[in-house]
Amino acid sequence: MPTMWVDAEGYGYRAMAQHEYETQWPNGMWTYVVDHHRAKEAFTKAMEELADIAPDHALVLAFGSTSNFRYSVFPQYKSNRVKYRKPAGLSDFYFWIRDNWITQSYEGVEGDDVIGINARADYGDVIASLDKDLKTIPGVHIERGGLIDISVYEADHAFYMQVLSGDASDGYPGAPGVGPKRAADILKNAKTAEEMWAATLEAYEKKHLSREYALQMARCARILRAGEYDLDNERPLLWQPPE
């Protein structure tokens, strides 16, 4: 049976955020509360809706581990998220998901990586995620209640777009002054992964930045794919450029 690989943390976080409320108390205190009962109902409904889109698929929900290899690649990775408050009881909610669904996680990587490592288009697998980063993984994806097919070229192009423009939410900057429009212009004539990497390197060099720095950004942006994780030794294999 083919698998639908689901971003458990993304859907779980959304369900929690949808049912978070401010509460004012008589003594002038304000608190944030999350209605876990409604959040669980919302999450369950979301999983049922995903299952209805591809009813012949088994759902496996991907979680990340507490460690992340990207922290050693680029120490500032996701450091900006420390200041953001998470919905109350999020960890407990994730435990509930683990207790009620089939889940998968690997040491040292994020849930997105677990999906990228396992999702196999040739097996008929489907990817369900709310995160645009998963568009860097080729294969069949759920989007707007339907299915779309992302080719290897499209996935590679999305990856190099991320390498060039960075990701503010993940805390890696990419090439200074290069936003999505400029990144698309840099890559417009590149037809292969090798040409995309060459164009990316040239853009970094024009900013007086080294190949090593560009490689750091690429390894932050890279959602691991099949063959890029050593399952026997439980460690990620750092992305190598196509040169």
Which residue ranges define each predicted feature?
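Domain-level signal for Mg2+-assisted phosphodiester chemistry and nucleotide/NA-binding surfaces
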Residues: M1-F95
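Extended two-metal-dependent nuclease catalytic cores across DNA- and RNA-processing enzymes
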Residues: M29-W30, D56, N80-P242
